[in-house]
Amino acid sequence: MKLHEHQAKEIFAKYGIPVPEGKVAFSLKEAKEVAEELGEFPLVVKAQIHCGGRGKAGGVKIVKDMDELEKAVESLLGKVLKTFQCPDGKPVNRVLIEKATNIDKEYYLAITLDRSKSKPVIMASAAGGMEIEEIVKENPEAIIIETIDPELGLMPYQARELAFKLNLPVKEFASIALKLYQIYSDLDASLVEINPLVLTKEGNLIALDAKLDIDDNALFRHKDLEEMEDETQLPQLEVEAKKYGLNYIKLNGNIGCMVNGAGLAMATMDIIKLAGGEPANFLDVGGGANVEQIANAFRILMADPDVKAVFINIFGGILRVDRLAQGLIEASKMVELRVPIVARLEGTNVEEGKRMLQESGLNFIIAEDMWDGAKKAVEIANKQS
């Protein structure tokens, strides 16, 4: 789950990480009130969306007076902001108004999980700001990476070593780095990022931007954070799927996937790619896969206009395949299936399950195995496109 910049900065401030003075506004009236409260110009107006690249897309504006502030806010609120990271755009429903910072140099600082090591890492660079992606592509060595022992946490000597390498005030930088790790640990974050961390001309370090992503699997421990989620930033199909209790993530392909089990769902997407296709989603219906759950999954898949074919990949372990087939038949009668359905079934009573689907009179195409199913789904999707 992603938080907005202003939400992340509020958390940073509680932990003692310096952030610019500012406040969020949901309307022009509120923006003017915030400007008056801050009491001086120049101010910075920042669109709040769950996407990077705002600066290059005109989502961050420096204003010198109230007239410029009004124009900036009106140009952002209620609009869709498209960035290179989000070409389809995200709606801007709030803006952050902050005091401008006297920047001397920009840096990068983040903590995330290195899945190859199964350990968190802290990453820092003397090259921060809007160009960080390009800099890392051209010169990966520009990023300094330190592995963190999860049993010990980020050690003070590691934070000091980073400060020395970046030629930054040691005490101040180490304090920020250690507090950033505390946030990462306390909130079960998957990513905490400051880009840029700026050194001001007065010699202070300030988190000019803030990014905080929370592990969805840990949200049961953080109900206060879960309530902060802005669903307007999510694909509406994901919001709908969440109501049904489905694990669904929208992707950019044209082959809808319905699978039981997260591991099999990942393998299904891989084999679709291997067959030359593009998955339209990740969708794990869970181990139960009852009629209602399957019907809801069909509703989500059929609501996606990009979907040209559906690949159902089910392994019946505890769940008998004949019962699952009956569930598929009943669910398909509840939802209009506008595209062909390729089904690969395996497990207990699989032959009976296949026979039931073939005799149902519905638009099911039976696959012999995963590879056969993936090839059939790709072929159908290409014909439908």
UniProtKB/Swiss-Prot annotation:
Presence of keyword Iron: no
Superkingdom of origin: Bacteria
PROSITE patterns: ATP_GRASP, SUCCINYL_COA_LIG_3
Enzyme class: ligase
Keywords of the record: ATP-binding, Ligase, Magnesium, Metal-binding, Nucleotide-binding, Tricarboxylic acid cycle
GO MF assignments: ATP binding; magnesium ion binding; succinate-CoA ligase (ADP-forming) activity; succinate-CoA ligase (GDP-forming) activity
Pathway: Carbohydrate metabolism; tricarboxylic acid cycle; succinate from succinyl-CoA (ligase route): step 1/1
Residues given in the record as substrate binding sites: 260, 317-319
Pfam family, one: ATP-grasp_2
GO biological process: succinyl-CoA metabolic process; tricarboxylic acid cycle
Any one annotated GO CC term: succinate-CoA ligase complex
Cofactor info, note text: Binds 1 Mg(2+) ion per subunit.
EC number: 6.2.1.5
Catalytic activity: succinate + ATP + CoA = succinyl-CoA + ADP + phosphate; GTP + succinate + CoA = succinyl-CoA + GDP + phosphate
Residues given in the record as Mg(2+) binding sites: 195, 209
Classification via NCBIfam families: PRK00696.1 (NF001913), sucCoAbeta (TIGR01016)
Stated family: Belongs to the succinate/malate CoA ligase beta subunit family.
Function: Succinyl-CoA synthetase functions in the citric acid cycle (TCA), coupling the hydrolysis of succinyl-CoA to the synthesis of either ATP or GTP and thus represents the only step of substrate-level phosphorylation in the TCA. The beta subunit provides nucleotide specificity of the enzyme and binds the substrate succinate, while the binding sites for coenzyme A and phosphate are found in the alpha subunit.
Protein's name according to its UniProt entry: Succinate--CoA ligase [ADP-forming] subunit beta
